[in-house]
């Protein structure tokens, strides 16, 4: 129904962003909202997919068409909901997920929150041969530039983002200690570092 939303990015939250267009603010769930940090208070285009449930209508947004297509493929798999699909795409590019599927790399897929061995196997069974690996993923429309900000804030916001993706506080306790030992130029960088730690 909504192929994309183009407008001013007004807010960033751990699980979603808000884009204002024609006087309406659209709440859009994203894999990693801090990818959009550079564009806060500026115009942005986000590829979207509307999912209607009995209790809600949720808009999901992505920085590229490849990412959106991968999300739509994942949620067709039995046992994979939008939240799990977002968690996978928060840490991996579409091509990385496709390679794991084509190579039947269940171990790679089970690193994500909510994805056990049975679900990983189902992803492979349902999607192998149906997802095309491109030569290179389309450049993200949203590249985050390094900015100088308070390190503690970066880490705190990164931890909120990781918790929103479904990782437990126990899993994140060690991650937070490691993140606090390093310096980051953006929340997105801290989130990416945290994701690498939690899935390693």
Swiss-Prot record:
The keyword Signal does not apply. The keyword Magnesium does not apply. Residues 1-63 are annotated as: Domain I. Keywords: Cytoplasm, DNA damage, DNA recombination, DNA repair, DNA-binding. It is found in: Cytoplasm. Residues 64-142 are annotated as: Domain II. One of its GO terms (molecular function) is ATP binding. Residues 143-149 are annotated as: Flexible linker. GO terms for cellular component: cytoplasm; Holliday junction helicase complex; Holliday junction resolvase complex. One of its GO terms (biological process) is SOS response. Gene3D superfamilies: 5' to 3' exonuclease, C-terminal subdomain (1.10.150.20), DNA helicase RuvA subunit, C-terminal domain (1.10.8.10), Nucleic acid-binding proteins (2.40.50.140). Residues 150-200 are annotated as: Domain III. Belongs to the RuvA family. Has three domains with a flexible linker between the domains II and III and assumes an 'L' shape. Domain III is highly mobile and contacts RuvB. The RuvA-RuvB-RuvC complex processes Holliday junction (HJ) DNA during genetic recombination and DNA repair, while the RuvA-RuvB complex plays an important role in the rescue of blocked DNA replication forks via replication fork reversal (RFR). RuvA specifically binds to HJ cruciform DNA, conferring on it an open structure. The RuvB hexamer acts as an ATP-dependent pump, pulling dsDNA into and through the RuvAB complex. HJ branch migration allows RuvC to scan DNA until it finds its consensus sequence, where it cleaves and resolves the cruciform DNA. Homotetramer. Forms an RuvA(8)-RuvB(12)-Holliday junction (HJ) complex. HJ DNA is sandwiched between 2 RuvA tetramers; dsDNA enters through RuvA and exits via RuvB. An RuvB hexamer assembles on each DNA strand where it exits the tetramer. Each RuvB hexamer is contacted by two RuvA subunits (via domain III) on 2 adjacent RuvB subunits; this complex drives branch migration. In the full resolvosome a probable DNA-RuvA(4)-RuvB(12)-RuvC(2) complex forms which resolves the HJ. This is Holliday junction branch migration complex subunit RuvA. The gene is ruvA.
């Amino acid at each position: 129904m909504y192929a994309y939303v183009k407008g001013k990015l007004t807010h960033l939250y751990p699980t979603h962003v808000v884009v204002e267009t024609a006087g309406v603010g659209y709440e859009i769930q994203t894999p990693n909202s801090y990818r959009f940090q550079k564009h806060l208070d500026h115009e942005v285009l986000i590829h979207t997919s509307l999912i209607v449930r009995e209790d809600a209508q949720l808009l999901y947004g992505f920085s590229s068409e490849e990412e959106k297509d991968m999300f739509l493929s994942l949620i067709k798999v039995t046992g994979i909901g939008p939240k799990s699909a977002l968690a996978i795409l928060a840490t991996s590019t579409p091509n990385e997920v496709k390679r794991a599927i084509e190579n039947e790399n269940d171990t790679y897929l089970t690193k994500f929150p909510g994805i056990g061995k049975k679900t990983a196997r189902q992803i492979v069974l349902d999607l192998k041969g149906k997802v095309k690996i491109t030569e290179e993923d389309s450049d993200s429309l949203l590249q985050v530039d390094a900015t100088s900000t308070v390190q503690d804030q970066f880490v705190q916001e990164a931890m909120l983002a990781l918790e929103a993706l479904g990782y437990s506080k126990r899993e994140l306790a060690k991650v937070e200690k490691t993140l606090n030992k390093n310096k980051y130029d953006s929340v997105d960088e801290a989130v990416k570092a945290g994701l690498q730690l939690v899935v390693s």
